[in-house]
Design a protein with these regions (language model features):
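N-terminal chloroplast transit peptides
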Residues: 1-2
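Short hydrophobic alpha-helical segments enriched in small aliphatic residues
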Residues: 5-8
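Auxiliary tRNA-acceptor-end handling modules of aminoacyl-tRNA synthetases
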Residues: 16-23, 27-48, 59, 68-71, ...
Length: 229
């Protein structure tokens, strides 16, 4: 017979352990590496760096009216520009970058113009840019009949929109608004003799770096700091 009533025997209950949750991975997978393009593989990056050098030169000449420009090429990881002007301090880089950001926000078009060497000389003399005159003379010595290429920012000469120009073969972006200002940084100041000639004036060289994205800039800066250790 089956026991019943209040005196019936009871079967003790057993606690059942809940299944263990799978252990979380101890280490999250590393983020994918940031692709760092080169000038050779990215014409867009090359244009960004070249145009940024022009924007920097325009900013410097706006802040220091008597500054004279020389050359401003792109280099492996950025650009530089040499100026004949009073010595700069590191704090001046912030002023220049702030002015550059304003120029970028204005979305000034970059316009190409071909002129004769005689017309280029006239404009350079009018602008009182002696170093550009030396550069022009070098071009004429190599090829007396070569047309001279100028790049203008804002508009063509003689128009109210014209802001700045340089003796330059390009290439450039279509307008300054295409420059990613959060991927641009001014890095350092150095002295450099014009043409490497110690008998010539000591120029102020501003080095900068420019990339396509802020992530690339951050990675570049991380690698620079890592190399210092």
């Amino acid at each position: 017979a089956v026991p019943h009533g209040r005196h019936a025997a009871t079967t003790p209950t057993m606690a059942v352990a809940a299944p263990e949750a799978p252990e979380a991975a101890s280490d999250a997978p590393p983020p994918p590496p940031v692709h760092m393009p080169t000038n050779d593989e990215s014409e867009e990056l090359l244009k960004i760096r070249h145009t940024t050098a022009h924007v920097m030169a325009m900013a410097v000449q706006k802040l220091w009216k008597d500054a004279k420009v020389t050359i401003g090429p792109w280099i492996e990881k950025g650009f530089y520009y040499d100026f004949d002007m009073p010595p700069l301090a590191d704090k001046d880089l912030r002023r220049v970058k702030k002015e550059m950001d304003k120029i970028i926000q204005q979305k000034l078009p970059l316009l190409r113009e071909e002129v004769s060497a005689e017309e280029a000389e006239r404009r350079i003399r009018e602008a009182e840019e002696p170093y550009k005159l030396e550069i022009l003379e070098g071009i004429r010595e190599r090829d007396p009949d070569a047309p001279i290429t100028l790049y203008h920012m804002g508009g063509m000469p003689g128009t109210p929109q014209h802001r700045w120009w340089d003796l330059c073969a390009g290439p450039h972006v279509e307008h300054t608004g295409m420059l990613p200002k959060d991927a641009i940084a001014l890095e350092s100041i150095a002295g450099a003799y014009w043409r490497g000639d110690e008998s010539r004036p000591m120029l102020q060289r501003i080095y900068g770096t420019a990339w396509q994205t802020a992530e690339q800039l951050a990675e570049h800066q991380r690698l620079v700091e890592e190399a210092k250790r």
